[in-house]
Amino acid sequence: MKTRNLLYTCLVGVAALLGTASCTRLEDTSYNRIVADGFEPTDEDVASLLSSGYVSWRKTMLLWNGVARAEMLCTDQDVIPARPNGWVDGGVYKRMHQHKWTSEDDIPLQSWVRTYDGINACNRVLYQIESGQIKLGDRQTAIVSELKVLRASYYYLLDDLFGNVPIVTRFDVPEGFLPDQSSRKDVYEFVVKELTENIPNLSERVDNAYYGRFNKWAGYALLAKMYLNSEVFSDGTHKDYDKCIEACDLVIGSGKYALEATRKNVFVTNNEKSREIIFALPFDETYVDDWNAFDFHMYSLQPENQATYNFQATPWGGVCALPQYIDTFDPDDRRLRDDFIAGVQFSATGDTLKCTMGNLVGRPLDYVNHVNSIDGSEENQGLRWGKFEYAQGITNRLSNDFPLLRYADVLLMKAEALLRTGRADEAARLVTEVRRRNFTDHPEKAAVSGSQLEGTTCYDYGRRDDSRTTHDGAQVKYGRMLDELGWEFSQEGRRRQDMVRFGVFTTRAWFSHDASDATRNLYPIPNRQILTNGKLKQNPGY
């Protein structure tokens, strides 16, 4: 049974505070109401107030067509090809794979709308506090700072995905208010300023009360991520790699976090006690009841795998890993077998599962590292996602918490920043530290050198489907570092960001994808938003 914390129990407090009828739904439908003047909440009510801002992170990241898809389905790691049972869906996944999305597509739209929902929730509670409607006494400074850091985390997403977006910091805006658009550089500087001014006021506690919330160390980890991406996020006006190292050192020096000896423990169902997780999105199949709350098992595994795990719902069988990506792994790397499901599939009682569709009906369901093309595939093609534990008997929703920031990320952010500032050997020691647990049977393979990190990638870029084969042997600066990130962080909703930072997102081909245009490093502002706000100017290339 998962430990219930602030974000599992938040709705009871929110419902009591705001007078809503529901105490189980996590849909943000009634926060436009302001609490009564002079209401003084208890400690539990304060947690509930904060949770209204945190709930949007779950929706933003992992609900259907959320940010996780925006960060993964367009990359060199993952693909949803057409399957015998569908997955064409109007061509949306093909457009994502080939970087041909438009301002009308739902994935950019949901990424924008849900992120601003989170910002609005933060602004609403800040308004209630700062206007005196909610009196917090000595707690006010810390709570206001936490809300501002949380709000900044949403702007981090917007800076990454869209770049040039409105910065809205008020809830009490006049009727008909339309915010001005800010440059990507201004958004970057706003986020950094909000974080640096407010992190010192955050709690240093690492316990159940602060799980799934921004404490000081989660704040510094987010700040490090901003600094690591500074050159991209600021349109080249900042190169804050030394500041990234400083922020990482504050997290490392706290002594609050550590690598799990067994990496898989970060991703098990009951992972809330992991010392590696710095900031997580809590999920529970009972308390988080959005239909697509966290459904990696549903849209990766084939329907037949219901019998493997005794799922309460039948999987749909869509997304898989790209063969070129799988081919980059050392066969002795535990992450290859821990993160992906391959080979012949069996039921929970040991019976061999058989294919039920396409050209393979009646044959054993045997996941193979081959996919025909984006336009057509057999149901056994492509290794399936398996990084997060799929517990026996679960519903269509996983109960694993989703780690957005973890200690391995801090170590590798520092390593990359060291590499980019000419300290490759120091970087190599950190990378080796992260690799070591993944090569326990072959410890000699864990070590990596500075010169290796400075070298190119082992990814065999080039078009590689049944219709066409091309080869791209061009060098990738620090490509081995990009490989290390790819091996460590698959299925964690971040590959696009890493590829953009290393300059390969729009310049390389893979599977059924040809090199695209640099304008695809940003998503388009959804057309619906431009029609609503005439002050918004579309990103170049759309």
Regions found by a protein language model. Name each.
Residues 157-160, 166, 229-236, 422:
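Short coil/turn linking the two alpha-helices of tandem helical-hairpin repeats
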Residues 1-32:
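Bacterial Sec-dependent N-terminal signal peptides
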Residues 24-89, 188, 196-197, 201, ...:
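An aromatic- and glycine-enriched ligand-binding surface/loop that stacks and positions planar moieties
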Residues 22-25, 40-43, 54, 62, ...:
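Long, intrinsically disordered, low-complexity segments
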Residues 93-99, 327-407:
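Flexible, polar/acidic helix-loop-strand segments at domain edges
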Residues 43, 47-51, 55-60, 85-162, ...:
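Conserved, well-structured interaction surfaces
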